[in-house]
């Protein structure tokens, strides 16, 4: 029985899916105007673990995470680089897949892009206007916040208590200062689309509502994202979605905590942004992932090299004990099981499941993994060789590895670097263009030997490590 903390009710609740055996999950993804920073990596890793645990428990998980590819930041970057918004978005979507792939994050069931849902967004807004929940003013379209009586239920604020502040848009053409933008009138030189309200582009909040509705339906099981998105983004999503769909938007809301850098908030003004693209060249991505899950997802986490080194030592401890079990298994001859060890291993697995069932407590799950490593080391020192016991150790190690997404072995020194793989893919593409299919097949086989799988996508050939 899985329980999770629901931000909506501010309490832990037993998870009950809308459809038995299936979890529909939406996670707010990045705005693709730059490489992701470790603040973006945290939800990617945390909710990947949530997904993996649901799958371990036998659920089918439909995991949707969007790309925001229409946004003020992208438009600003487009002007700075003199490149189209789409070109920049494509580049950083590719970079995102590379970065989270290095962190062993499973590919989403779907990664919708705003640009591909523009007609859906326009129709959604039109429906809200027709029902009186939205209105046109000066070329923009706004949501009537006060008309949605439940506004504030996620952030636990009442409409009367809300004040117009830095996080709430202000404008003279609104009926009410609390109203927020659904559609922005086009500005000269900016990307825009034709609509019944005039040429323009959508506001940020409406984008997620529409993509979630299109991909998962009127009501989803779990909506997740960073704590910083709780208000106003998720609050506004609820208002738009429930006004449009006449149904609850999400039954459970999950929010992960902030990341601080050396006990300071990560911000551009402090110049302490840590890009995943850069840091995984200095730190083993497996260590970074292990570090990220060493703290409960709702708690803040402090990033510094001392703590990362501690995570590295912890991961080495787990891997070394697993290697010792493998080495002992290679020379094992006695097949008689030692029931006391089997019972202890199963007790640790039960401990792991208990803490994961309790709001996905990865910090305590890692403690269980350390307990397993300690027991494994004890067993190896006794010079006993029961193949059944060794086999059970390996099974439970693999469960922990699969659920937490941390490989049991580090990358081999002779493993191809990503840059080398990309170069081979480019060479293969050129060989195919030149009709040198023998060379193209040779490269594919070479990559296959390295457990690298090529995938043809609309954006070109991508690869993943098996």
From Swiss-Prot:
* Cofactor: binding comment: Binds 1 zinc ion per subunit.
Q: Name one GO cellular component term.
A: cytosol
Record flagged with keyword Membrane:
no
Q: Give the subcellular location.
A: Cytoplasm
Q: What is the lineage of its organism?
A: Bacteria, Bacillati, Bacillota, Bacilli, Bacillales
Question: Protein name, please?
Answer: Cysteine--tRNA ligase
Instruction: Tell me the enzyme class.
Output: ligase
According to the record, the signal peptide region is none
Q: Which InterPro entries match?
A: Cys-tRNA-ligase (IPR015803), Cys-tRNA-synt_Ia_DALR (IPR015273), Cys-tRNA/MSH_ligase (IPR024909), CysS_C (IPR056411), Rossmann-like_a/b/a_fold (IPR014729), tRNA-synt_1_cat_dom (IPR032678), tRNAsynth_Ia_anticodon-bd (IPR009080)
Partners and quaternary state?
Monomer.
Q: Which cofactors is this protein said to need? A: Zn(2+)
Q: Which residues bind ATP?
A: 268
Q: Which reaction(s) are listed as its catalytic activity? A: tRNA(Cys) + L-cysteine + ATP = L-cysteinyl-tRNA(Cys) + AMP + diphosphate
The Gene Ontology terms for molecular function here are: ATP binding; cysteine-tRNA ligase activity; zinc ion binding
- Residues involved in Zn(2+) binding: 28, 208, 233, 237
Q: Which family does it belong to?
A: Belongs to the class-I aminoacyl-tRNA synthetase family.
Please state the gene responsible for encoding this protein. cysS
Note the superkingdom of the native organism: Bacteria
